Amino acid sequence: NLKHPQSSKEYFTRFCEEQGFLCEIQEDIENLTVRKGVVYIAIKQQDVVKVVKQGRLEGLKCGKDFGLLAYNDIPSYEVIDEGITSLSIDWEMMGNEAANFVLNNVPIQKYLPTEVRLRKSL
């Protein structure tokens, strides 16, 4: 079950429309066919692995034949298929904000900056 905010679908679709990008949201990737010239965005870590493996099964190379953008960076994205590009918040900043809340009981509602870590998957 996807724990990612469902409102992201609306914002993603709107962004694509405004930029003139064709987009499709496919929540079930069990039967995904990876296509040449398409960029995939994976929210869950296991979906990153599934897309890369499926691309290989179809004789396609990530970063050359298809693109992949992962949500929330992890260290292994640096080494999977020469690097998976990720979109992520600054986790250290989030940890500091959470610690400040716990230690000082200071409520926060704050947007954290998003970083793109560009690697060879795009």
PLM regions and their residue ranges:
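Bacterial carbohydrate/catabolite-sensing allosteric modules
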Residues: 1-122
